[in-house]
């Protein structure tokens, strides 16, 4: 039997009618015992990543510039200076819960700029 190239095979497929292609696919399934739906299922991702609509902002550590971090926490959360200091001293501590991811990123940027270590969960 003569071996044909991939290009020749594709050209042959182009010349076939839809019915002939369907018959060809059925013959391949039967000959090789292949079920194309099993391959399609395997190729589909099992789980998609869930987009969070609310996150939690946590202060992990104040870093070297504790006073600057206290001021930022005070301004962001509207706390008194003493309450902000207590919150920073108690790190790791939750600064805000159930906030929008965009807002959390904004807060994180300000805190990191002041020298804090922050996480968004």
Curated annotation (Swiss-Prot):
| Keyword tags | Ribonucleoprotein, Ribosomal protein
Which GO BP terms sit in this record?
Answer: translation
Q: GO molecular function terms here?
A: mRNA binding; structural constituent of ribosome
Q: Which domain of life is it from?
A: Bacteria
Has keyword Repeat? no
**Mind telling me which InterPro entries this protein's record contains?**
Ribosomal_bL12, Ribosomal_bL12_C, Ribosomal_bL12_C/ClpS-like, Ribosomal_bL12_oligo, Ribosomal_bL12_oligo_N_sf
> What GO CC annotations are associated with the protein?
cytosolic large ribosomal subunit
Which Pfam family name is an example for this entry? Answer: Ribosomal_L12_N
Alphabetical list of CDD domains matching this protein: Ribosomal_L7_L12
Disulfide bond annotation, renumbered to this chain = none
- State the function annotated in the UniProt record: Forms part of the ribosomal stalk which helps the ribosome interact with GTP-bound translation factors. Is thus essential for accurate translation.
Q: Which protein family is it in?
A: Belongs to the bacterial ribosomal protein bL12 family.
Q: How is the quaternary structure described?
A: Homodimer. Part of the ribosomal stalk of the 50S ribosomal subunit. Forms a multimeric L10(L12)X complex, where L10 forms an elongated spine to which 2 to 4 L12 dimers bind in a sequential fashion. Binds GTP-bound translation factors.
The cross-references to NCBIfam families, in alphabetical order and at most eight, read: L12
Query: Which HAMAP family would you find in this protein's record?
Result: Ribosomal_bL12
Q: What is this protein called?
A: Large ribosomal subunit protein bL12
**Organism in which the protein naturally occurs:** Mesomycoplasma hyopneumoniae (strain J / ATCC 25934 / NCTC 10110) (Mycoplasma hyopneumoniae)
Question: Gene name, please?
Answer: rplL
